Design a protein with these regions (language model features):
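M16/insulysin-pitrilysin zinc metalloprotease superfamily fold
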Residues: 294-310, 491-499, 506-531
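Noncatalytic scaffold domains of N-terminal-nucleophile
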Residues: 19-42, 46, 50-235, 240-292, ...
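Extended C-terminal subregions enriched in glycine
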Residues: 432, 479-481, 513-514, 522-581
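Internal maturation/activation junctions in enzymes
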Residues: 309-441, 580
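Active-site Gly/Thr loop motif
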Residues: 259-281, 362, 367-417, 457-486, ...
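Active-site rim segments in enzyme catalytic domains, especially the processed small/beta chain
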Residues: 67-92, 109, 251, 256-261, ...
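Bacterial Sec-dependent N-terminal signal peptides
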Residues: 1-20
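Short Gly/Pro-enriched turn/cap motifs at secondary-structure boundaries
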Residues: 71, 122-123, 200, 275, ...
């Protein structure tokens, strides 16, 4: 009898059920700062204590996380959504680097590659994070570059490195030794049994410190010349992308076999864009444009709006089956249609985000998972004709040939590591109404360091494909941004901020963010309950990394998933694997307008958490 009651309990809607969390909700009234490293959250707190706004604090936290190699470096990329309380609008910061001169389909194929490489100088897009940080600060912040870089510069002078990063360096030391400047920075004990720093050891990055000092020096000189705060920050930006720093990045990259030239850095610009959005049951959800995977979450919400998720019950077999298939449909479109909208052809986003198109896609969801689900044709829903109609029929054939499917023994560690690779998040909010959500990434360990700059280069070229049958919108060419997994999120309700949320984890990001959002909106969880709740991950989409594998029907569930749920999912055609955790750390801020306060949440593992006041 007890088992029957338990089964009923677990499939009931979550409403009214109290859940004990391992971490407490973070409460604040004046400001909140949440990110992937405690020291980086402290950097944000320092800026808030000096009178900075949420953008100033986010920039300081971004600088600190990049300095601490929290799955990113200064040569990586930054994506941000910012709510501006003055204009009452959400804006998007596109600081994704692009493909350098010579980075073409023919070039990579001539190197014997099926995809651009995972690591090394040929994996590098141009640095985006410095430009993204300085643009956000100049346009929406209040403080100087010197002030917001001060914590990062102190860290570069030496900080006690944490075990996670220290061990990551040690585990990747053979790859690091291939690149002389990386070896110099990362392996202070070269020749000893352990060549990486030990946990707690003071990790010094003198070259990076000097690079940051040059930016501050340039800002100071501009201010002495009666330049405005904004002009002085952009002068520093100019030095990074067109001055001596750029020259050393190019020299050091080319010395190690890379493609950068000086015009690649000089011509790259940050873009301030209109985000994409859909309305889900009265909540406007904002994501970056289709050069990210962000719209896949919006497509999933449109599809799921056609189902009564609450009545299915939180993480019931029916719920998991429905959400899994909705994600599969959205990600099949991602894999074929998404790409840099600055290049032709442009992705059919109007059709892809159409509610009518979502109804058509929702009609494909059945009681059994379809492992062969492919992209749809959104062009009729925006009054157009699909220029790649002929490729839709061959898409599934190409994927089947290139990918062997799920191995009998289940998902292996290397595959999961690739699928969930990299990234961190930065979430800030203040009493004035500014809200920032960032998912910076790129340049994770093992990274190629560009000459004597201390700047680790991105590895994001690998997210391009070389076969138009896989995605005709995402083929590499100079100046083009790859379709990346990075995906900050903001939600608005009744014209006011409702939720800022982001997560690390590669292709799993928008899957976990979707479930987190539904946990709050459909099942009435608070922000911490939603962050700690069990998620599931699909591998039916193509990985954006490495060999771009696909595992049709594969699903990872948390290892405490009840046996009757496992049994039902097996009947529905799923190939299950079970892990202690199934999500990268989610960081989020929920806005309590009834009491005028912030509620912060972060997953109950990893180093992510925050500080508030």
């Amino acid at each position: 009898m007890r088992k029957v009651y338990l089964a009923i309990f677990l499939v009931l809607p979550f409403i009214g059920i109290a859940q004990q969390t391992q971490k407490p909700v973070l409460h604040g009234k004046n400001w909140m700062a949440i990110t992937g490293k405690p020291l980086a959250a402290s950097a944000g707190a320092q800026i808030f204590s000096l009178g900075g706004n949420a953008v100033d604090a986010a920039c300081a936290m971004l600088a600190a996380t990049a300095t601490m190699w929290d799955m990113l470096s200064w040569g990586g990329e930054t994506q941000a959504l910012i709510y501006n309380p003055v204009t009452k609008k959400v804006i998007a910061i596109n600081a994704m680097g692009y493909a350098p001169t010579g980075a073409t389909v023919d070039f990579y194929k001539s190197q014997g590659m099926s995809y651009p490489p995972e690591f090394g100088p040929l994996a590098a897009t141009t640095p985006g994070t410095p430009g993204g940080l300085m643009t956000m600060l100049a346009e929406y912040g209040t403080m100087s570059l010197e002030q917001v870089l001060a914590p990062a510069m102190q860290l570069a002078k030496g900080y006690p490195i944490e075990a996670q990063t220290a061990n990551m360096i040690e585990n990747n030391k053979e790859k690091i030794k291939e690149w002389p400047y990386s070896k110099k920075v990362f392996l202070p004990h070269l020749g000893e049994e352990r060549e990486a720093p030990e946990a707690g050891e003071i990790f010094v990055q003198e070259e990076l410190y000097q690079t940051l000092a040059k930016l501050v020096e340039t800002e100071k000189e501009a201010l002495k010349s009666n330049k405005s705060r904004k002009e002085a920050i952009y002068a520093a930006n100019e030095r990074f992308y067109k001055g001596d720093i750029a020259k050393e990045i190019v020299r050091g990259t080319r010395e190690q076999g890379g493609l950068f030239n000086e015009s690649d850095l000089a011509n790259w610009k940050v873009k301030i864009e209109e985000p994409l959005s859909v309305n889900y049951k009265g909540i406007d959800v904002y994501k970056m444009q289709e050069w990210t995977q962000g719209p896949a979450l919006l497509q999933s919400l449109n599809i799921l709006e056609n189902f009564d998720l609450k009545s299915m019950g939180y993480n019931s077999a029916n719920y998991i089956n429905t959400v899994y298939q909705a994600m599969s449909l959205a990600f099949a479109d991602r894999d074929f249609y998404y790409g840099d909208p600055a290049f032709n052809p442009k992705s059919p986003m109007k059709g892809l985000l159409s509610k009518e198109y979502a109804k058509e896609r929702a009609s494909l969801i059945g009681d059994q998972n379809d492992p062969k689900i492919g992209p749809g044709d959104p062009y009729p829903f925006e009054g157009g004709t699909n220029p790649y109609k002929n490729l839709l029929d061959t898409k599934s054939e190409v994927v089947a040939i290139n990918n062997p499917g799920l191995p009998i023994q289940g998902l292996d560690d290397p595959f999961l590591e690739q699928f969930q690779r990299g990234t961190t998040s930065v979430e800030t909010a203040d009493a004035e109404g500014w809200v920032v959500s960032i998912t910076p990434s790129g340049g994770w360990v093992p990274a190629v360091i560009a000459g004597n700059t201390g700047v680790g280069l991105s590895q994001r070229m690998q997210s391009f494909v070389l076969d138009e049958k896989l995605n005709p919108y995402n083929l590499p060419e100079p100046g083009k941004r790859p379709r990346v997994t990075l995906t900050p999120s903001l939600a608005m309700k009744d014209g006011k901020p409702f939720l800022a949320f982001a997560v690390q984890g590669g292709d799993s990001q928008d899957q976990n963010l979707l479930q987190f959002f539904l946990n709050i909106v459909e099942f009435d969880m608070n922000v911490q309950e939603a962050a700690e709740a069990a998620n599931f991950n699909s591998y039916q989409m193509q990985s954006s990394f490495g060999a771009h594998e696909i595992k049709p029907g594969a699903i990872t569930l948390r290892e405490d998933t009840p046996s009757w749920i496992r049994s039902e999912l097996k009947k529905k055609g799923y190939l299950m694997d079970f892990w202690p955790r199934t999500s990268g750390p989610i960081n989020a801020i929920w806005f309590d307008w009834k009491h005028g306060t912030f509620w912060g949440g972060s997953s109950n593992y990893g180093e992510d958490y925050g500080i508030s006041w």
